[in-house]
Amino acid sequence: MGLSRQELFGKLLEQIHFPEKDNSAFRNAAVQSVVVHKKSRQWEFHLIFNKALPYDLFTQFNQSLQLGFKDIAKVSLKISTPMTELDESQIANYWQFIINKAISDTPMLQQACLQTAPEVKDGRVTLVVENEVIKDLLAQKALDKIEKSYQELGFPKFRIHPFVDQSASQAKIEELKAKHEKADAALAAKAAARIKKNEAAKKTAKKSAPVAPADGPVQLGRMIDSKQNVIQMKDIEGEERSVVVEGYVFNAEIRELRSGRQLLTFEITDYTSSFSVKKFSRNSDEEAQFANIKAGMWLKVRGPVQEDTWMRDLVITAYDVNEVTHIARQDKAPQDDKRVELHTHTTMSQMDATNSITELATRAHKWGHPAIAVTDHGNVQAFPEAFSVAQKTGIKMLYGMEANVVDDGIPLVYNENHEELAHQTYVIFDVETTGLSAIYDKVIELSAVKMQDGNVLERFDEFIDPGFPLSEQTTNLTSITTEMVQGSKTEEEVFQMFKDFCKGCIIAGHNVSFDMGFMNTGYERHQMGKIAEPVIDTLPLARFLYPDMRGYRLNTLSKKFKVALEHHHRANYDSEATGHLLYKFLKDAEARYDVKYVDDLNKHMEENNAYRHARPFHVTIFAQTQAGLKNLFKLVSLSNVEYFYRVPRIPRTVLTKYREGLLLGTACSSGEVFTAMMEKGYDQALEKARYYDFIEVQPKPNYAPLLEQHVIADEGHLEDILKNMVKLGDELEKTVVATGDVHYLDPHDGIYRKILINSQGGANPLNRTERPEVHFRTTDEMLNEFAFLGEEKAHELVVENSNKIAAEIDDNIRPVKDKLYPPHMKGAEQEIQDRTWNTARKWYGDPLPQLVQDRIELELNSIVKNGFSVHYLIAQRLVAKSNKDGYLVGSRGSVGSSVVATLSGITEVNPLPPHYRCPNCQFTHFYTQGEYSSGFDLPDKKCPKCGTLMVKDGHDIPFQTFLGFKGNKVPDIDLNFSGDYQPIAHNYMKVLFGEKNVFRAGTIGTVADKTAYGYVKAYERDTEKEFRKAEEDRLAKGATGVKRTTGQHPAGIIIVPDDMDIYDFTPVQYPADDQTAAWETTHFDFHSIHDNILKMDILGHDDPTMIRALQDLSGIDPQSIPMDDPGVMALFSSPKVLGVTEEQIQSKTGTLGLPEFGTRFVRGMLEDTHPKNYSQLLQISGLSHGTGVWLDNAQELIKQGIATIANVIGCRDNIMTDLIHYGMDSEISFQIMEHVRKGRGIPDEWQEKMHEANVPQWYMDSCLKIKYMFPRAHAAAYVLMALRIAYFKVYFPLVYYCAFFSVRADDFDVVAMSHGKDAVKQRMKEINDKGNDASAKEKNLLTILELANEMLERGFKFKMVDIEKSDASDWLIDGDSLIAPFRAVPGLGLNVAKQIVAAREERPFLSKEDLAERGKVSQTLIDFLTDNHVLDKLPDENQLSLF
């Protein structure tokens, strides 16, 4: 008897190795039929289920089915069910799969559908689409296919009804997405609760916790047989039934599914390629194992390779996952015989190295190396991190830099004498060679012309037979072939002829030092001595005479000075062109600089920024002592500020001046000693080496680019050069040391550097050759690299001498100070105390209320004891000056948590508990039990003693949120100045502390994730490679964090104490190497010296500018505006107080254009909460800035009636004050607040204490969802400004709109605005209809048009620009209208606008022609103004009047 249909299905599950055979969804499942198409090898499986499978299960089953029959046929699946009701969640879950399956042949519709999702309501399936075009195309081409695809997967028949949301289609789509995400989160929470219940009986009052990680190594599924072949990932190119791979995990993520199960996804690499791996959990044990899988571990994985429809890539579906031990590279040398790496680049070497000093030093420490150096290109920005890792690991850090050094000037003439230059006979010569090395390469052509007064007297042109065939590269560069030189005269013959040719003449050439090197080497080889005649180099001569030229190549100069050069890179043509140029140059030099004699030339070799034109060479510089570190900081600063040209440069004389306490090494192949040895020979290298303290040689692979370019002929020549470098050190008795020039950690990291260098294109010379192997080598690897020197010598260079250099450097050098060094302000402590106590007594009476007395003493004790008085006094001076100059200052951050800041005039926010105080008799009454959240919410009340209306104040903010519980945290006083006033405030710091003591806070910009991903894609394109998505992720990860540029904090000002200088803390530079910048910045990222030197944040903000504009327009003092005005408060619930309806302004509140409360997101919050007073607005401000605070937290609590806007957690300080009001200890309350605001949750023991204090469960649950929170003082300051502005909006509307459009608006549609509300509404509709396709400029304009529409609906008008009245930038009030400024005209910039006004003030414009000429207005703008009747009173041209 055959198998039943149900049994056939069971057999099918076994055949495809499906892991979830017992899933309840398979109950009664059966095989209805299998239709086999033999010719096309396609099998259709017709299956029966009770209902459509949960999507996650369907995906897993479908993939297993496809893989199970991969080698037999292509499989399709059709499902039948008795299902009659629609399941909304299932339809949504399947949506993406269905769309990709059904309409992949119409990409536009496919993309449009993937951006939305269907909804089911009362059995009707609807779909929001963006526009009518999409709707029509769906009906014509797609809906039937989509509906049919659903039915083939077991869904009942249904129709999809598309519709267009006319008001905000894109917003609707986003809302749908958010709804589904919320549903996912809710299901995930239920799943977590179920897991908790099954695993252990815990206290019901506690929140469900995630499954705890399992003990021991990871093992999911079975142990993978060690005999099973591990496949390299690069060899997997298609789907496979089963593979075993092993690799390093670099990304891991666990996702809760709606089914209650978990999906583990991780990315793994074996460094040949990478894969994404997926595994669905089957039970809580597996989920405990999932929690153990983290980035950084090594795993072995077995499972099928399948094309994943979601990821659109090959993915491994793991059956078995085993943690394995990976044996990394080890330094096998004895512990007392390890090397020290003295040449290491970190991520601070701009776009050139891929590992941080932390990673490099940690590896060195792990290998047992006693020390490691940091030597980045031209900067020391890794020093703070280097110091930190040295402190943690105990490894000795050697602080250095690979500098770009230049000779101060290149000689204009060699072998100078006192001969006259005029009327001399000159021999201008040029050589063509087989390469760049005078030692290893040969001259193959020597050409010269003898000239006098610009006329050619005689020519010399000889080929030289080098004795070997010419390389293809030589022929390509010189156009000289082997046949041309074969049989020519010998070098000795030609050189002797040339020597005779030059007698009695002055010699010259272009870049002649190169040619002289070959000639002198050849002369000496044949015992002719060196060239004795004066030799003029036209290259530095041209640079001196014409410093502003962009290039000085011979062809460039010939073109500029109209000198014929027919065959560049042929010696005879080059020589004659150079001769004609020399004649012109010498005449110019005499006329401009009175250069008449040969020895006059070198008097000018350092002029006209000669350092810019010298070719930089690399020098390794180490700080040997603390004094040396300061000198190094000075050199870095000078190189960035005084001598920057393309790269930071250090002139040799400057290096010599600051050499005390420094050790100098010869660096890499770009060092002058190695270059001299390679190109000019031992003697010249010897002379240059005398300048250095130690000689560096590097592994042969480091020099591979020189071999590739044929600069060094072969490995034999390279070994000769390196042996001579060693010999040179021995002769000079200088230490010769083997260094690695490390740019990355391990060999497989080299590709990250290739990607970074590739991203810079042809501009980077490193792109012209293959990159050498410059990983961090172990002692034994390094010894092996230098084995050609012999075992003893290799050990000396690699181990003995590297340790010797390290020992010569002091052990206790500190690049970062160990404490704070605030600036000095005489009497600061006393002044802050006096100001505080005096104001306190003025406000609260004498004696002070105990509460006020205690709070002030608490704060002043911390401030004075920890040396923070000067911080406060600087802030007080800045605020006082700004206020005096007519600009209010808003505080940011937590400074409003300090009553000392309030009483000394730094902030308007009062952190004391809500209270009344009488301004007449100083009667006070405080509310300390949480009765009120803000003093601004208190009802108006007269003093019970004297009858004066009392001041209402206090926001109940603990001081601890500012300076920490112990009051010793360095204060970060952030102040919001008007954007107009910010530069004045910045420069005032120079007035207070002196020009040399004030700097901008520097920043370092590194490669971000998205940028790195772009680099990877570019690398794929340029190298014609294609990587899997997981491999792209790995490569992008490897390229992130590398320094790209530098910048400056927009507000941070660093202040140096007057008894120190900036070099005690950091070098300085210009931001982004911009030599025209107004301020120098710290070279170190300011975060790294935050605890050592004072930084003031003097920010620019629109709110104070707006307040000043409102005050100027109205004459009303903004500080007199009440904070509880009923009309103003009504704005936050309805626009009625403005005299308009919701429909008229398309908003349910009246807060359009109000800072903090005008965005769509916050207006939605207002609609949900209907705030009635200041403290509730303060809550809104906190909720809108936090993360994990509003969405799926406070919003739900309010909607469900569990809490109100008044008592949900809005700001971080609420937590501390709330818990104290519940009766908890203040220190524990503070610690809980700190944990929660940083997203760290609440430890179990603290949760116990919260339960004991009867803190509600909803409150604790809310805390556990929070990731980041806003400071209450910050929110209080922002709301204060917002309410002042709102007051003008309600009661002085035209003043408000005038200020808003003048201060906060940059984008206008002045035509629509001047044509009235219908035109404005039409323009708004046009932008809204574009949805996400609207440009950023259009989205900004939409915000402005919303305000314009509101103003028009309130009965006011806009007027087009008025040529006689309009301001350049500000809108003007004219009756019930606003006149547009000139900058509102499209395409008319602010500079032209100012020019128009300035010209008009001189005299009225007579005509359009006059406007164009004096106003600098283009014809396009004239046409616009004409079309819009702005110029109706002006004729086209000026007209003369006879009478």
Swiss-Prot record:
Family: Belongs to the DNA polymerase type-C family. PolC subfamily.
GO BP annotations listed: DNA-templated DNA replication
Domain Exonuclease: 426-582
Protein name: DNA polymerase III PolC-type
SUPFAM superfamilies the UniProt entry points to: Nucleic acid-binding proteins, Ribonuclease H-like
GO MF terms held by the record: 3'-5' exonuclease activity; DNA binding; DNA-directed DNA polymerase activity
UniProt keyword annotations, A-Z: Cytoplasm, DNA replication, DNA-directed DNA polymerase, Exonuclease, Hydrolase, Nuclease, Nucleotidyltransferase, Transferase
Enzyme Commission no: 2.7.7.7
Catalytic activity: DNA(n) + a 2'-deoxyribonucleoside 5'-triphosphate = DNA(n+1) + diphosphate
SMART domains given in the database record: EXOIII, POLIIIAc
Domain of life: Bacteria
Subcellular location: Cytoplasm
Alphabetical list of InterPro entries matching this protein: DNA_pol3_alpha_NTPase_dom, DNA_pol3_finger, DNA_PolC-like_N_II, DNA_PolC-type_N_I, DnaE2/DnaE/PolC, DNAPol_HHH, DnaQ, Exonuclease_RNaseT/DNA_pol3
GO CC terms in record: cytoplasm
Function in brief: Required for replicative DNA synthesis. This DNA polymerase also exhibits 3' to 5' exonuclease activity.
Xref: CDD domains: PHP_PolIIIA_POLC, polC_OBF
Organism: Limosilactobacillus reuteri (strain DSM 20016) (Lactobacillus reuteri)
A Pfam family assignment: tRNA_anti-codon
Lineage, broadest ranks: Bacteria, Bacillati, Bacillota, Bacilli, Lactobacillales
